[in-house]
Amino acid sequence: MDLPDVTAVQHESRQLALASSAAELHGGLCGWLSGGGADSADWLARILADSGQVAPQQGGALDQLRQATVAQLEDRDFAFELLLVEDGAPLPARTDALFDWCRAFLGGFGLAAQQRPALSEEGEEALQDLARLAQASSEDFDAADEDDTALAEIEEFVRVAVLLLHGDCVMGPRFRQRLN
């Protein structure tokens, strides 16, 4: 299932008077789900820690974002994608969006997992690496082609790290529960 267009997510976010970018919303949602948080229509209230937050309109871009993200995280072909910024955005905007995504992921993951979850050694390392990325900024990159390639590699790393953490916190326990 494909993610909705980033512009549609941003538009609906503005309609709900949210201060978060599309990248931050997707990062928070991914963190929430990867940390074991429930897939529910009121996901915005949960990741924003605001019980008064209105649930996204059913069938709207934010609802589609939730549904597609859940499907992608559960996909056996590892089809998970990051929702960052519009295609063709300048390198600084793309790097800022990625680092914002990582910060929001950590927030959502922390809200869902709360106490320290049982992570594999690789999961621990992935979480630490995501925390380091969350501290970075676009100033760490130049507009050179090498940095464009480096950013693509970092995006791929983040994608795999999220799938690993989701596996540790959601898929592993689910599998163990079926065995018992």
From Swiss-Prot:
Coiled coil, from the record: none
Pfam families: UPF0149
One GO cellular component term: cytosol
Family statement drawn from the similarity comment of this UniProt entry: Belongs to the UPF0149 family.
PANTHER family: UPF0149 PROTEIN YGFB
HAMAP family, alphabetized: UPF0149
Identification of the protein by name: UPF0149 protein XCV3523
